[in-house]
Amino acid sequence: MTTLLQLLSNYYKAKLDSERIYNEYVQSQYEFASLDKLNNNKGDPKKVVDETLFLQRQIAQLNKQLQLSFQENEKLLSVQKNQKALYQSKLSSKDAFIDDLKLKLKVEQISVDKHNKERTPSTGRDEQQRNSKAAHTSKPTIHLLSPIVNRDKPNNQTNDRGGNDPDSPTSQRRSRGLRSLLSSGKNTIFDSISKNLDDEINENAHIRNDTTSSKIAGKSPSRLSALQKSPELRKERNNMILKEHILRSKDDQNITSSRKLDNIELSSIGDSTAMTSRSSTVNANDILGNEENDGITKLKRVNKLTSSPVKRDCSTNKKRKLTKQRIATLPNSDEELSNNLNVDEFV
């Protein structure tokens, strides 16, 4: 029994000792935790002060950097303004130099043109002739109202629509016929002859005026005065011719009246003196009026012929161009005409 009791007593003693040790440990932990808290509360304001001081230093550095950057920007802006003014002055000087060169070139061109005009005064006429030739070539070709092939070929260079060349033999070429020509809307010689003639007359008149002006410009002032006086002299000559013509006609009438009186009896003359006198006066007045009208018309014709040499040339040019157009529209041979006038293509 003694051994069991001793064992129980030892057990409870050991248990009490263990609880006591545990309690002491817990108390010691609480004490350490409270001390740490107190220490932490004491160190916080120091850290805040340190951080604020550090931030203030950083702000001061940044302000210095900003001021430096502003100063650098101002310097760069001043440099840029100076460079801009310098380049603008250079550009203005170069522009003035270019304008001077242009003026010099214009003056030189004007002097060269004057020199060329003095040497060759007929350059304008040559240019107008070239322009008139270009206009003639650009005009549409005229064809007669007949199914003849290759009529609208300028200078025999373009090919036919069917792929036939104008230089190929007649057996290989195909005629298009009258219906195709009419449906294609081409002008016939009866449609466009008046327009072409008017254009040619106007062009010839311009060319003639240019030639006369160039001839007059090349003449001396004495010749110009003589030319200006020439129409007056012509008018005087024409008036003299008219007067001579009227006087001759009056003399002829007097001669014829005397011859008629020789054939008439005296009794009839005595009875019809009043009638003959009246009729003679009326006839004389009519004849004089007709003669004056004829003289005026002749004067007008003479003045037109003397003052306008362009119309003769225009009429001759008309006839020549009409003959050329008719010759151009005719076929080259009888074989072409027989090949072109196929009965199947008319139907």
Swiss-Prot record:
Description of how the protein assembles with itself and partners: Component of the monopolin complex composed of at least CSM1, LRS4 and MAM1. The complex associates with the kinetochore.
Post-translational modification: Phosphorylated by CDC5. This phosphorylation is required for the location to the kinetochores during late pachytene.
Species of the source: Saccharomyces cerevisiae (strain ATCC 204508 / S288c) (Baker's yeast)
Transmembrane segments: none
Keywords: Cell cycle, Centromere, Chromosome, Coiled coil, Meiosis, Nucleus, Phosphoprotein
InterPro entries assigned to the protein according to its UniProt record, in alphabetical order: Lrs4/Mde4 (IPR018479)
A single BP term in Gene Ontology: spindle attachment to meiosis I kinetochore
PTM annotation (Phosphoserine): residues: S168, S230
Domain of life, per lineage: Eukaryota
GO cellular component: monopolin complex; nucleolus; nucleus
Name by which UniProt lists this protein: Monopolin complex subunit LRS4
Keyword flag Phosphoprotein: yes
Note: Present with 1390 molecules/cell in log phase SD medium.
Coiled coil ranges: 46-118
Region feature (Disordered): 112-183, 208-230
Compartments in which it is found: Nucleus, Nucleolus; Chromosome, Centromere
Signal sequence, renumbered to the chain: none
Organismal lineage: Eukaryota, Fungi, Dikarya, Ascomycota, Saccharomycotina
